[in-house]
Amino acid sequence: MAAPRVAGRTAKRGGALLLLCAAAFALPACSGSGYQYVKNGSDGSGTYFKVPDAWRIYDENAFIKSRNLSPTKAKAARAEGWTVAFDASSKPSLKHFNELATKQPFGIAEVRTLDPKERDEFSLMAMRNYFVPVDDLTQTGGELVPLRADEFTRDGGFHGLRLTFEFTLPTDKEAITVDQVSIVDAGTKEVHFLVVSCSSSCYERKKDTINNIVDSWTVKER
């Protein structure tokens, strides 16, 4: 399985199609492949990924509103980065963000500026624990099964970690599978993060689609 891509200054094969398809926030794939592209950026740079046409995409405003943040915190969240959510459920809801063992895949894509302290400390361990505190889970009795841990580097100094794991909380009988990728730039100024998760039985049924989504996570140098 291919590692998530980071496009450097030189166009990669298929890059022209991706740029054309990703000219807006979300629109159907140009080739009629059954996927729609989501993009952060408007000048040919930024972060791209694709999800199936039938999945619901929640833009940044909808996602932030669902978090019930104060006006000050909501403004800060917008200033720090970009976040969208997506849901495969036939009854999509941002409430699924708070449900780990969803019956259908649910995901988050985020681009966030790291503060000076985070830049000094951001590491593979930070990438591993970015969405779910994996290390804490194993120390508090949670059962965790690693399925994939692929480190990678790309042109322009980008590097990252693709991590897939299954876990069960001590208080829960249902296993959850998380498939995530973190990419940081050479200066460790921004983290580009994508995660898709659902119950492990759901993941087994949908793993090919989920893999297509995570593999499509592309960062183009600004």
Where are these predicted regions, by residue range?
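C-terminal motif of bacterial Sec signal peptides marking the signal peptidase cleavage site
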Residues: 26-29
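Short aromatic-glycine motifs in intrinsically disordered, low-complexity regions
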Residues: 37-48, 131-136, 207
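Proline-anchored loop/turn motifs at beta-strand termini and strand-loop-strand connectors
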Residues: 44-65
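Soluble non-cytosolic domains of exported or imported proteins
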Residues: 46, 117, 121, 125, ...
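Surface-exposed amphipathic alpha-helical segments
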Residues: 55, 188-222
